[in-house]
């Protein structure tokens, strides 16, 4: 199945979170938590402004981002993997290495 996001929505594949604490203790289950980093898989055409023009998104496919998994985030299955669909405003930063 292929999912194409609309407008200012972005599809993100969550990165695996580190399963060790700062002290080196291995965390399991819910103690490990969910990562708020992910890779952008697809982006919509852009946000529609009040004047009707379309502002393209700042993120692009392949970007690694830090996001806020807020109430608007939607979890879906795509090619047997869990992905998140959220708006660009839920993305807090682009990770540059």
From Swiss-Prot:
<dbReference type="InterPro" id="IPR018369">
    <property type="entry name" value="Chaprnonin_Cpn10_CS"/>
</dbReference>
<keyword id="KW-0143">Chaperone</keyword>
<dbReference type="GO" id="GO:0051085">
    <property type="term" value="P:chaperone cofactor-dependent protein refolding"/>
</dbReference>
<dbReference type="InterPro" id="IPR011032">
    <property type="entry name" value="GroES-like_sf"/>
</dbReference>
<protein>
    <recommendedName>
        <fullName>Co-chaperonin GroES</fullName>
    </recommendedName>
</protein>
<dbReference type="InterPro" id="IPR020818">
    <property type="entry name" value="Chaperonin_GroES"/>
</dbReference>
<dbReference type="GO" id="GO:0051087">
    <property type="term" value="F:protein-folding chaperone binding"/>
</dbReference>
<dbReference type="Pfam" id="PF00166">
    <property type="entry name" value="Cpn10"/>
</dbReference>
<dbReference type="InterPro" id="IPR037124">
    <property type="entry name" value="Chaperonin_GroES_sf"/>
</dbReference>
<dbReference type="GO" id="GO:0044183">
    <property type="term" value="F:protein folding chaperone"/>
</dbReference>
<keyword id="KW-0963">Cytoplasm</keyword>
<comment type="function">
    <text>Together with the chaperonin GroEL, plays an essential role in assisting protein folding. The GroEL-GroES system forms a nano-cage that allows encapsulation of the non-native substrate proteins and provides a physical environment optimized to promote and accelerate protein folding. GroES binds to the apical surface of the GroEL ring, thereby capping the opening of the GroEL channel.</text>
</comment>
<comment type="similarity">
    <text>Belongs to the GroES chaperonin family.</text>
</comment>
<comment type="subunit">
    <text>Heptamer of 7 subunits arranged in a ring. Interacts with the chaperonin GroEL.</text>
</comment>
<dbReference type="GO" id="GO:0051082">
    <property type="term" value="F:unfolded protein binding"/>
</dbReference>
<dbReference type="GO" id="GO:0005737">
    <property type="term" value="C:cytoplasm"/>
</dbReference>
<dbReference type="GO" id="GO:0046872">
    <property type="term" value="F:metal ion binding"/>
</dbReference>
<dbReference type="GO" id="GO:0005524">
    <property type="term" value="F:ATP binding"/>
</dbReference>
